[in-house]
Amino acid sequence: MESTLSVSDEKLTNSSTALNNCGDNKESSQVLTTANTTTDNQQVQPKSQHQQSASTEPLSKERTNISLENDLILVDPNQQSKNTVSDSVQDTTGVPSDHGKQQTIGDQIKILISSNPLNIEEYSSHLNRLATILYEENFTSDFLVTLHYKILQLMDELPKFVDLQNPLKSQLYTIIDKNFDILIKLATNYKVMEVSTASIRFLTTVFMNLNYWEVYNLLNKKPVLYHFLNLIEFDLNDCYTRFINDYQRFTYDKITQPTVKSRSRSKVTKKRKVKGDSDFAGSNTATATTSVTTPDANTSHEGKQHRSEAFFSLNPDTSDHDKYVADVISGANVQKRKFRPDVKLEHHRIIKKPQPAADKLSTKSSNYDPDVIHECQLPSAEEPHKLCLRRFSRKYELIRHQETVHSKKKKLFKCFVCVKQNPGVGPRIFTRHDTLAKHIRVNHKISGKEAKAEVAYSKKHAEVVEEGDITVHVGRRKTKVDFELRAHMEKRKSSGDDTNYMETSDLESGEEEVTFNK
């Protein structure tokens, strides 16, 4: 420490004597001496190399408590040095002065204003230090305008540190990790409106440019970020979709598809097998007994598992699908309407509206008879101790109602057009084939024979699952008229008025989304 000080013993003695003779109790935190003589200049020259190396890294932490700037020597009052200079000038109270603190912060501000970051790590630290100084306000008013200009300039330089060429190496998350708390304080409590609005705009810009995995990891580390994301209406689903679309080619090129399928199949098979065994046993103690089964049962179970995995696979083989649709369109594969026996309608009642014989038309459609109403006699899904008693004007509507609402086993119809157009996201799955037909017609703009072929192929390859494995959510937006009509019909039914004898299934024609229970 003695080798880095350019102070002569004579000057130190004179300065200490002068301080003792003053008699006042003013606190002195730093000693400022000017090297004017030629002997002092000769003492500074041997350590010029150390001064130059320290100035190349303005944002790095100082190892010593002494820093040189121009011709002045600054001694940090917060640390006790072993040299005679600090011992001779230290106040008897041992408390650093306010003047020393202001001068130390002033030197830091000068360095922060004059320097510029070179990478994103320095950029994050630089911005954090400036924001902290502004919020604490432990500086003189001379630096206020300069600090405002510098922090706004740093925020505008954000695009320089965004790696657009290689987004996989993005480190924008470090900005949020280091600066979110202090910038939120500036945005909510700082007195200068320009800096507050710039802080909110800066945080929003950084979040909008983050990758999906960066947002996910930041939310795990700081759950409080979720409130800010809601405030700026950040769409996490849209961020995930962009992540899938942007990086799909990277995943496909680097990882072969068979490897991914085999790994995922093994995990899914193991998970579903454990779940099936636990459901069959009914308790954890009886799980071990389920492993002793017949070979035929194991074979059928494995066959069902592979079929389910093929149904819900993200990238299935669509060659069979393409051939099937092409044959239907060309007429090579003629679809025959299957006969649906009335065995499916054993739990129903036919209600005929009394009407004079003179009013009956001689020509009636075989599919629709306005005088016949079909009533469901199965137990209600909401109230099992009561009958459903839903009424429909057409027989196929009652069949569809019983298959959709009352059946313990559900049929799942997959949209293979979604699979072909966007294989990375996964297929849309419906519980009703008429909803699938509407989805194909509206979303994919496919109609005619091609649409019928798509629906027929999906019905041919439908997956049958138990009722407890899925949860069906109606995704169609219902209008106010829908809810009022339903409430009116429920009121008429509870009052016992049978004048409103017919209920169509138009309100049930909305899109359905299938979610699997874990």
Curated annotation (Swiss-Prot):
Xref: Gene3D superfamilies: Classic Zinc Finger
Residue segments, region Disordered: 1-63, 75-101, 261-307, 492-518
Sorted UniProt keywords: Metal-binding, Nucleus, Zinc, Zinc-finger
Residues in C2H2-type zinc fingers: 374-406
Superkingdom classification of source: Eukaryota
Ranges of compositional bias, category Basic residues: 262-274
Coiled coil: none
Comp. bias intervals (Acidic residues): 505-518
Induction: Induced by caspofungin.
Disruption of the gene: reported phenotype: Affects filamentous growths and leads to hypersensitivity to caspofungin.
A molecular-function term among this protein's GO annotations: DNA-binding transcription activator activity
Polar residues compositional bias, start-end: 1-41, 77-95
Described function: Probable transcription factor involved in the regulation of filamentous growth.
Listed name of the protein: Filamentous growth regulator 15
Organism, as annotated: Candida albicans (strain SC5314 / ATCC MYA-2876)
